[in-house]
From Swiss-Prot:
Keywords on record: Lyase
The UniProt record lists the keyword Lyase: yes
Listed Gene3D superfamilies: Cyanate lyase, C-terminal domain, lambda repressor-like DNA-binding domains
Keyword Chaperone: no
MF terms in GO: cyanate hydratase activity; DNA binding
Name of the coding gene: cynS
Entry annotation: catalytic residues: 95, 98, 121
Name of this protein: Cyanate hydratase
Annotated function: Catalyzes the reaction of cyanate with bicarbonate to produce ammonia and carbon dioxide.
Pfam annotation, one family: CYNS_N
Record-linked HAMAP family: Cyanate_hydrat
Ranges that cross the membrane: none
Domain of life: Bacteria
EC nos: 4.2.1.104
Length: 155
C-alpha cells in the first residue's frame, strides 16, 4: 500500500476521471455499480479523497478506460483535503472542517449531478443532531443537514 505525499498526481488523475466520466456520459452511480462500496465513498475516491480496494479500482478504471498507472494511483492513500484556506482551531469545529475537506468535492459533485447547477441553502436550512447507540459500543452522532436547493439562474 502506497501513500501520497504530493497532491498533484492525484489531482491530475481526478481531472482524467472527470473528463472520462463526461466523455462517456456516466454518472458517479454508473461508475460505482458493482464496487460493493457506497456511492459517497467511491465518488470521494474518484475525486482524490480515498483509496479504492484493488477490485474496485480495476472496475472503475475499466469503465473509465484508465490505464494501469491510474489503477495503482486509485489504490494509493491520498493526501486528503481539497479545500485550501484557514484551519479552525476548536476541536469540534475542526472535525466538521475535516469532513468538508474530505467530502466537500463529493457533496458538490453529487448535488450538481442530482439537482443541476446551484447550491444548497444555509439560510433556508434545517439541522438535526441525534445521539444514537453504536452497536460496537459508545455512541454515534447522526447529523442531518436539510437545505433548500437553489438553482443558479442565468442573467
Amino acid at each position: 500500500m502506497q501513500s501520497q505525499c504530493q497532491p498533484a498526481p492525484r489531482q491530475a488523475l481526478t481531472d482524467a476521471v472527470i473528463a472520462a466520466k463526461a466523455r462517456k456520459r456516466l454518472s458517479f452511480e454508473d461508475i460505482n455499480q458493482g464496487t460493493g462500496l457506497s456511492l459517497a465513498y467511491t465518488t470521494a475516491a474518484l475525486l482524490g479523497q480515498h483509496a479504492l480496494p484493488e477490485a474496485a479500482a480495476r472496475l472503475v478504471a475499466e469503465r473509465l478506460e484508465l490505464d494501469e498507472d491510474a489503477i495503482a494511483l486509485l489504490q494509493a492513500i491520498p493526501l486528503r483535503g481539497s479545500i485550501p484556506g484557514g484551519v479552525p482551531t476548536d476541536p469540534t469545529i475542526y472535525r466538521f472542517y475535516e469532513m468538508v475537506q474530505i467530502y466537500g468535492t463529493t457533496l458538490k459533485a453529487l448535488v450538481h449531478e442530482q439537482f443541476g447547477d446551484g447550491i444548497i441553502s444555509a439560510i433556508n436550512f434545517k439541522l438535526d443532531i441525534r445521539k444514537v447507540e453504536d452497536p460496537d459500543g459508545g455512541h454515534r452522532a447522526v447529523i442531518t443537514l436539510d437545505g433548500k436547493y437553489l438553482p443558479t439562474k442565468p442573467f
